[in-house]
Amino acid sequence: MVIFGFLLLCGLGQAGEIPKTLILTWEGDPCTTMTAQWLRGPGLGNRPEKGKEEVVKWKEVQASEWKTLRTSSTDFPDPKKMGLVRWELVRARWQDLKPDTEYLFQIGDAPVRKFRSAPDQLQKPVIFVEGGDVDVLESSAQMMKLGVQQDPLFMSVGGDLAYADGHDVVREIKFWEQWSQAACAPNGRVVPFVAGIGNHEVKGGYVQDGATFEQMRERAPFFYALFGGLYRKAEPVALDFGDYLSLLLMDSGHVLPISSQTEWLKNNLEKRKSVPWVFASWHVPAFPSFRTWKHQKEIVQVRDEWVPVLEGSTVTAVFNHHDHNLQRVESEGSGGRKIPFFGNGALGVDPRPQQCPESQKLSKAFAQSDYVNVVQLRADGATIRSLGPQGQELDRVEFPKNAD
């Protein structure tokens, strides 16, 4: 019965087809909301007719009666196609969920799937996984599956997802097909995806001089079509999980200027001084491993603007990406504390060597390898393990509970 239940929830136990690009994510409070979204169009099932939206049935796992949730749909960006849009993005949004509760849902007559709302208190250990720089490769699929096999509450990916560069819609769709296949955890639960932005989400990669937020959003059409519900404003995002975890999702100069976010970072770190586990995440590293400290202006700016603010705060650690290898450094501490920086993004891409002399002096761990960070939070402390492609442990750091 246990095996049958797993097959059913992973889409192998009954007729019908789960959308090939099914993504669960959050646009609001992770403890009480959930968003499911998927694409319809060529190769992905018929686009919904006007007035005939897809219907989702859902219920708590233990409940006897199913409820009905109506979906909404919008055109999905299709930059290479002149004329009719080929794909449509369909969404189902749940509100007022119970924290730390499992729910079943069924899209049309497709197999039943399961999700879990986030707990609002840290009464038992919580795991999430983290990485960046993925691409659409066999190694990318392997690394995402490895992350999901850890049975995490969610996966956070800090930019450079599909390498679609804001224009290659076919590549973008292939990436989400790959994620959808990987996203079923060992117990049949679909793992939510928390996305950060990198240069390969944006046409041109970085903020254009004089461009407005609205103009830059248009240069990252897929990212904002999928995740604009979370990134609504011209500022970073703070994703809060009850009273125990906060993720500060920054933009390292891709749509938002770096300097425009410094005051936000300072204020939001101050607001979360009582939160035991606070992580900041962005794409371009403050402490590169393949590039040098002055290789590009964004590296210099995030190090000059944000590192002193973080060193003067109670932040637990920082996740960086962009340089395609595993490197952990401790910041120099001139702003107050030495902060661990976990980088630098290799969740499927071809790993690069460590050749930054400035960062090597601060380096605590390095591997020219793909990796995924597995973060376990407990009442008495936290552990971050970095796993290589075969699940081998490449690095491990133990954190005592924040005493503040």
Q: PLM features: what roles do these ranges have?
A:
Residues 119-135, 261-300, 394:
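Mobile, glycine- and charge-enriched loop segments
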Residues 110-165, 169:
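An acidic-aromatic substrate-binding cleft motif
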Residues 128-130, 155-157, 195-196, 280, ...:
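Residue-level marker for buried hydrophobic side chains located in beta-strands
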Residues 88-93, 99-116, 171-277, 293-297, ...:
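Extended active-site neighborhood of metal-dependent phosphoesterases/phosphodiesterases
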Residues 49, 65-89, 125-140, 165-166, ...:
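Acidic/histidine-rich helix-loop elements
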Residues 14-130, 149, 368, 374-404:
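Acidic, histidine-bearing metal-coordination/catalytic regions of metal-dependent phosphoesterases
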Residues 133, 159-160, 198-199, 250, ...:
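Active-site glycine-centered loops adjacent to acidic/histidine catalytic or metal-binding residues
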Residues 1-11:
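Bacterial N-terminal signal peptides
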